């Protein structure tokens, strides 16, 4: 099993500026990060199998509270597989198998424990996918959906939570007058923010983003990135992205994965500018991947 570099790092390889230099004023290297922020979740010696194929190999990864952690690496390296394991999406397909644990703190719940209800896991850990996936319902009912599953029936409570979630997703001003319209009437960027609001309505502790801007235009992408920057004040975020400039812009910490293994983990600025592992350097400079 490969070791993980804790925040703070080790002796560095030659400087790399191409990716880090592309980041804007919101880049997380401008923030003063504590040496060891509090943990919100952690993968512990976690392996995953699609049938007989081992897709993830003994992953140990810290996820820090109210920070953004980016997962980068070439296609097929296991980024999305790891992300989906965090809220039990793999349970929906037969033949999949876990080893190890993914824990949510502070109660230290092993999210993979069969005794833990996957629906409750998905309430605590929301997920936003590559392409916007609003339900064939009204804007209002999309946001209220998770609350209704939880048994909420009070209209006043639902109204308040829907408004709060839409404001949290920076969408309220655009849809307040059209809550009963179909969600599919929204633009692609608005639909993605609606999906974020749907997650926020259940007050999640962690948000998972699986390439959330890959299907969006540059303006909508900038809007989602700005929203992620705001959301980190309230929730912990884990994001998969193929866009290394995006990882540099939005994340505090970055993990580089390859062939199902975690190769390197550290503060984003450090990993992009002074990676410890040669494999990481080759990937972020375009010599591989």
Swiss-Prot record:
Record flagged with keyword Metal-binding: no
Reactions listed under catalytic activity: phosphate(out) + ATP + H2O = ADP + 2 phosphate(in) + H(+)
Alphabetized UniProt keyword annotations: ATP-binding, Cell inner membrane, Cell membrane, Membrane, Nucleotide-binding, Phosphate transport, Translocase, Transport
Coarse class of the protein's main subcellular location: membrane
One Gene Ontology biological process: phosphate ion transmembrane transport
Top-level division of the source organism's lineage: Bacteria
Top EC category: translocase
Gene Ontology molecular-function annotations: ATP binding; ATP hydrolysis activity; ATPase-coupled phosphate ion transmembrane transporter activity
Record EC number: 7.3.2.1
Membrane topology: Peripheral membrane protein
Protein location: Cell inner membrane
Family as reported in the entry's similarity comment: Belongs to the ABC transporter superfamily. Phosphate importer (TC 3.A.1.7) family.
Family matches, as NCBIfam families: 3a0107s01c2 (TIGR00972)
Quaternary organization: The complex is composed of two ATP-binding proteins (PstB), two transmembrane proteins (PstC and PstA) and a solute-binding protein (PstS).
Protein name, per record: Phosphate import ATP-binding protein PstB
Biological classification of the source: Bacteria, Pseudomonadati, Pseudomonadota, Betaproteobacteria, Rhodocyclales
């Amino acid at each position: 099993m490969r070791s993980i570099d804790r925040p703070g790092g080790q002796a560095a390889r030659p400087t790399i500026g191409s990716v880090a230099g592309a980041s804007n004023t919101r880049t997380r290297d401008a923030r003063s990060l504590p040496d060891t922020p509090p943990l919100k979740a952690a993968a512990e010696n976690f392996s995953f199998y699609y049938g007989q194929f081992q897709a993830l190999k003994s992953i140990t990864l810290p996820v820090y509270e109210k920070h953004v952690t980016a997962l980068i690496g070439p296609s097929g390296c296991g980024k999305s597989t790891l992300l989906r394991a965090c809220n039990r999406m793999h349970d929906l397909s037969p033949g999949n198998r876990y080893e190890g644990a993914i824990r949510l703190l502070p109660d230290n719940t092993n999210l993979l424990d069969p005794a833990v209800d996957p629906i409750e896991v998905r309430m605590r850990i929301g997920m936003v996918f590559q392409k916007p996936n609003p339900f064939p319902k009204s804007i209002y009912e999309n946001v209220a959906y998770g609350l209704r599953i939880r048994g909420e029936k009070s209209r006043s409570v639902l109204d308040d939570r829907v408004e709060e979630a839409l404001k949290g997703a920076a969408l309220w001003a655009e849809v307040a007058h059209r809550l009963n319209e179909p969600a599919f009437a929204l633009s692609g960027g608005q639909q993605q923010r609606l999906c974020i609001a749907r997650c926020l309505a259940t007050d999640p502790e962690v948000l998972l983003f699986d390439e959330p801007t890959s299907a969006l235009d540059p303006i909508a992408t900038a809007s989602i990135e700005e929203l992620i920057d705001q959301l980190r004040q309230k929730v912990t975020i884990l994001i998969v992205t193929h866009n290394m400039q995006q990882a540099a812009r939005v994340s505090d910490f970055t993990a580089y994965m390859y062939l199902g293994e975690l190769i390197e983990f550290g503060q984003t600025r450090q990993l992009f500018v002074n990676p410890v592992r040669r494999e990481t350097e080759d990937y972020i400079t375009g010599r591989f991947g």
